[in-house]
UniProtKB/Swiss-Prot annotation, chain A:
Main location: cytoplasm
Keywords: 2Fe-2S, Cytoplasm, Iron, Iron-sulfur, Metal-binding, NAD, Nitrate assimilation, Oxidoreductase
Annotated protein name in UniProt: Assimilatory nitrite reductase [NAD(P)H] small subunit
Entry cofactors: [2Fe-2S] cluster
Organism of origin: Bacillus subtilis (strain 168)
């Protein structure tokens, strides 16, 4: 369904997303890392670490944070901000759960 | 045969300790016979409360198993009670009509639990808490019934109550006195304890006297003297113990409350001794274990004709963790006309400390909530220390490390450090100096010290520090594993074992992690420790694996992966090379490179292609990415080489096949060279083997990376089988004692080569370690094959989502 200002794209069934692990999702020209956290909520961020472009989808997840597998930068899945002592941020995306499915909203 | 007949009546802790002491003095002097009324070998009765809690198995509390009796030529009769001693003819008679002559006799009949002489005490569901049978009764009842009543709010009753709570029962504790544990605590500490235990879920009925146990065949409730009553499906009587003097009395041996003994544990009848709870010494029959171990020592020396100081009675100290609450009491702890107290009471933190003085001498102490000062105060009480020089309040403050003198430095080697297990200072020093123990954990494993209540651990550490001096690195033992916790690696591993924890999330939860889901440091570490401790049952937590180990491939900087198939010993053939070549072409893999480990690396494979690449290769994973065995490099060796004295390729391949996939604290690299020219570079490997004429040399702790280190010569062996066996023992010891992410080089520097050698030279330890290693190896499966069989996991990990909007 498309309306004027907001696009909603289906990523898949929520039960198909592995828990506390990332999934690489390609939408148009974007590459996202989508995480299903242990509390069942969904987070999506761009799949590139601001340090050297590492793939965040493969990182270890703890609570609301993911650790980049390349050099262990710690990134918030809430607001995309890289935690001290490092600096930077990643783009975050909004997601929506409807019934059995997860949607990306942008 | 010439040996004297020694008969022990009673197979419990005190009696058997006396036998152990006798054996250590005069192994072959006596022909020993033991009679035990219970059907079990010698076990630690005190740990029954842990069995009740579900924490521990019966076999874990066994002090001496059936083998011990055989190994020491002791004739053991279980399930047999001695009913009479014929002091004239020097024989004992049992209920199986057996007549056993003796030259020397020891009575160690222990205590009988006191059962209230009230109507209903013989109903089903009413039990004491003395032996394994009682414990089984309580465990069985907890599965069927809900309400438990414990009569007796002393030490034993509270331990029983804690156990029953753990089993899911509703527990009420009935006590005659106005506060709990009045034998060990004063009113203030007793009430603090009650508050704590009520928070844990226990209900208390104080100043209540039970008049009748009501019910039909089975108990249904209790009725009290004041007319009130409660319901109960299980009643545990923990109202006290009485020395078991029946045998003594029936045989004409003088008894009072207990069997009367002198300062050398002799009864009034020649050649008959008594020890333990059944004995009465200077009017006291002891119910705690530390004095009984002291008695056993004196008895043994006296019986063997060795000069010994007489037993003069014990100053009692109790250090307990009742239900997780720290409680300590020692000496004479109640105030009176001549005895005055100094108290510190912190209501906010729930800490209460009191010392009792007679004039300027410290005679007693009670600590609640923080009992870390217990050992120091007890030492002062035993020495009848004069405190006139010390400022009053500072007695109760912990002394700083430099300012205070160490407690243990002033102790003689004979003095007992661990009261629960009767371990002396000398025994601990021996363990350090002769057996190479260099941590409290190792001393615990070697001597048993600090393995029960744990209260003596600070003293054990002190002795370690003094004995090892600058070699003792306290900080290595205490470093927290990451910022999420204050616990060190040893502490975490201990807790996992003690509490039977089985998932990373459970560990972080139960041990109070600051962050509930940990961090990139501790999650993989916990996953490793859990799997190391329980290899067959633990289910690996893939979310706690670093990406390489989760994907079973090496991630590259651009998000592609490298694939390294197994090439045992660096040996290949045309079939495998053709398979590899075909796969490279089919998947257009950009880079093919030889690795340092003597195999082929296919670099630049896309994530979603990995399962198909593995399927087409049809070779096992080379684990080039893991905290595991990497490779066993080899030189050509005697199969072709002019110089090789041994077949290095065959041994290398055997080693790699045996240990592939083993989870280790960090990567392990091995090599086998066929002669000292060392073409396989065995000198810089975690475990390197070098062939010599007639055998192999094993080198350990080498490292060819950032911290270059030459390996140390561990040992020389003759056969391939020995190499495999000792490699297994060595690696298992590394797995069990190293910190996660500690290479063998760092670990070996820390624990010391001679210590490792002493472990490997101990046949018993070798057997145990190899047993655990083989158990671990038995569950290994090739991960690439696994993925091919588990389509769902493959999809979750390797497939990307590509949407169409």
């Amino acid at each position: 369904m498309v309306n004027k200002d907001v696009t909603k794209v289906c990523i898949g069934k929520i039960e198909e997303l592995p828990e506390q692990l990332g999934k690489t999702v390609y939408i148009e020209d974007k590459e996202l890392a989508v995480f299903k956290l242990s509390d069942g909520s969904i987070r999506a961020i761009e799949n590139r670490c601001p340090h050297k472009g590492g793939v965040l989808a493969e990182g270890i997840v703890s609570g609301q944070y993911v650790f980049c597998p390349m050099h262990d930068w710690k990134i918030s899945l809430e607001d995309g901000i890289v935690q001290e002592p490092d600096h930077g941020c990643v783009k975050t995306y909004e997601t929506l759960i409807e019934g059995e499915h997860v949607y990306l909203v942008y | 045969m010439g040996k004297k007949q020694l008969v022990l009546v009673g197979n419990g802790m005190a009696g058997v300790r006396a036998i152990e002491e006798i054996l250590s003095i005069a192994k072959d002097e006596f022909q020993i016979t033991i009679f035990g009324a219970e059907p079990h070998p010698n076990y630690n009765r005190i740990l029954l409360s842990k069995v009740l809690q579900g924490d521990t198995d019966i076999k874990d509390i066994t002090l001496n198993d059936w083998d011990w009796y055989e190994e020491n030529n002791i004739q053991l009769y279980t399930n047999e009670t001695v009913i009479k001693v014929d002091t004239e003819n020097k024989t004992v008679i049992t209920d199986a009509d057996r007549i056993q002559p003796y030259d020397e006799l020891i009575l160690a009949t222990g205590s009988v639990p006191f059962i209230l002489p009230i109507p209903g005490a013989d109903k089903k569901g009413v039990t004491a808490f003395r032996d394994i049978k009682d414990t089984d009764t309580m465990l069985a009842a907890s599965k069927q019934y809900k309400k438990a009543a414990v009569i007796g709010g002393g030490l034993l009753g509270l331990e029983a109550a804690r156990g029953l709570l753990n089993l899911g029962m509703d527990v009420s504790v009935i006590h005659l006195a106005p506060f709990l544990m009045e034998r060990q605590l004063d009113a203030t500490a007793g009430r603090l304890l009650q508050n704590e235990l009520e928070k844990q879920g226990m209900t208390f009925l104080l100043e209540k006297q039970t008049e009748e146990i009501v019910g039909d065949d089975r108990v249904e409730g209790l009725r009290f003297k004041d007319g009130t009553s409660i319901e109960a499906d299980l009643v545990v009587m923990a109202v006290g113990i009485r020395p078991n003097t029946t045998l003594g009395a029936e045989s004409g041996i003088p008894v009072n409350r207990g069997i009367i003994v002198n300062d050398y544990m002799q009864t009034e009848i020649p050649h008959i001794y008594a020890v333990g709870e059944c004995a009465e010494h200077r009017g006291i029959a002891y119910g705690l274990v530390a004095p009984l171990y002291e008695q056993a020592k004196v008895l043994a020396k006296h019986m063997c004709g060795i000069e010994t100081k007489p037993y003069e009675g014990s100053v009692l100290s109790t250090q307990l963790k009742v239900s997780g609450v720290e409680v300590f009491s020692a000496g004479d702890f109640n105030e009176s006309e001549e005895k005055k107290a100094i108290k510190v009471f912190d209501e906010q933190d729930g800490i209460y400390k009191k010392i009792v003085l007679r004039g300027n001498q410290i005679v007693g102490a009670v600590l609640f909530g923080d009992s870390s000062e217990g050992n120091r105060l007890f030492s002062m009480i035993q020495k009848e220390a004069d405190i006139s020089e010390t400022s009053k309040i500072s007695i109760l403050q912990p002394l700083s490390q430099e300012a205070g003198t160490s407690i243990t430095a002033a102790m003689s080697d004979d003095e007992i450090i661990c009261g629960c297990n009767g371990v002396s200072k000398g025994a601990i020093i021996q363990a350090i100096q002769e057996k190479g123990c260099s941590s409290t954990d190792e001393i615990k494993a070697c001597t048993g010290a600090s393995r029960s209540c744990g209260g003596c651990k600070p003293l054990v550490e002190e002795i370690l520090q003094h004995t090892l001096g600058s070699d003792f690195d306290a900080s290595a033992q205490k470093e927290a594993i990451c910022g999420c916790t204050t616990l060190s690696r040893d502490e975490v591993v201990e807790e996992i074992k003690a509490k039977g924890l089985s998932h990373t999330r459970e560990v972080m939860n139960v041990l109070g992690w600051k962050t509930p889901e940990g961090c990139s440091k501790c999650r993989p570490a916990l996953n490793y420790y859990l799997g190391m401790i329980n290899p067959t049952k633990y289910e690996d937590d893939r979310t706690s694996r670093f990406v390489n180990e989760r994907m079973h491939a090496n991630i590259q900087k651009d998000g592609t992966y490298s694939v390294v198939p197994r090439m045992y010993g660096g040996v290949t053939n045309s079939t495998d090379l053709r398979k590899i070549a075909d796969v490279v072409d089919k998947y257009e893999i950009p880079l093919v490179k030889m690795t340092g480990g003597q195999r082929i690396d296919l670099i630049g494979v896309k994530k979603e292609d990995l399962p198909k690449v593995w399927e087409d290769l049809d070779m096992p994973s080379g684990y080039a990415y893991g905290k595991t065995l990497r490779t066993v490099k080899t030189c050509v060796g005697e199969q072709f080489c002019r110089f090789g004295t041994q077949d290095s390729m065959a041994l290398g391949i055997a080693l790699e096949k045996k240990f592939e996939g083993l989870n280790t604290p960090h990567k392990v690299k091995m090599a086998v060279s066929a002669c000292p020219r060392n073409c396989a570079e065995s000198g810089i490997k975690d475990l390197g083997v070098v062939g010599i004429d007639g055998g192999w040399e094993l080198y350990v702790g080498g490292n060819g990376g950032t911290h270059l280190r030459a390996g140390d010569l561990l040992m020389k062996v003759k056969t391939n089988e020995e190499v495999l066996e000792y490699a297994g023992t060595y690696l298992q010891y590394y797995r069990e004692t190293a910190n996660y992410l500690e290479r063998t080089s760092a670990w070996l520097e820390r624990v010391g080569l001679s210590h490792v050698q002493s472990v490997l030279n101990d046949p018993e330890k070798r057997q145990e370690l190899n047993g655990r290693m083989n158990e671990t190896l038995s569950v290994h499966k090739d991960p690439w094959k696994d993925f091919l069989e588990d389509k769902q996991t493959s999809k979750e990990l390797f497939e990307n989502v590509v949407t169409t909007s």
